[in-house]
Amino acid sequence: MMLSIIEYKAACKKTIIFLEEAGFILNKDEKNRIQVVEYGLDNLELIGLQLVEYINTERCCAKELVLFRRQTCPEHRHPEINGKLGKEETFRCRKGIVYLYVEGIPTLNIHAKLPIGKEHTFTVFHEIVLKPGDQYTIMPNTRHWFQAGEDGAIISEFSTKSIDEKDIYTDKEIIADCNRIVEENI
């Protein structure tokens, strides 16, 4: 199911306020291009994210990822595409706490709260806790997922070219490119 225009506008407004309260300045064009991603699961409050993409060329990409309280970006990986390595990305926490999970030795007693009914779609549990100023680089084709802490979070993402619709999700119910931009200048 897709977000309604009203839900999309509300998420965009909340995203703008969250970014501005943290000292980020968005121009009108950036505000009009906010992407709201709910993955076709109709549960944006728990599984989804909001983002502003500044640039995405053949060589680089820069975005701000906004997650509200306990919002989760589901487990996925960035595969090889047409013989080229998948996306390599660096997450830098700007606000809040981010619980990032990657392949590796599982952490006992993780901080994240798995979305009820979707527990089986999370398989990697090596925890990296990012606080403002911390960063972590995720290599291509590495399974990962992340969740904001109690106060939400802002993550600056710096990466190679982003082709989000080619990401591979552990949860087969996910629609990779669902509700990114409902309508320009809404």
Report the location of each language-model feature.
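Glycine- and acidic-residue-biased ligand/ion/polar-headgroup-sensing regions
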Residues: 68-69, 86-108, 112-115
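Double-stranded beta-helix
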Residues: 107-123, 143-186
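A short, N-terminal "cap"/entry segment at the start of jelly-roll beta-barrel domains
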Residues: 1-61, 81, 118-120, 184-186
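Conserved short histidine dyad/triad with adjacent acidic residue
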Residues: 64-86, 106-107, 129-132, 140
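Conserved metal-binding segment of the jelly-roll/cupin
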Residues: 125-149
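Short, surface-exposed beta-edge/turn micro-motifs
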Residues: 60-62, 87-89, 152
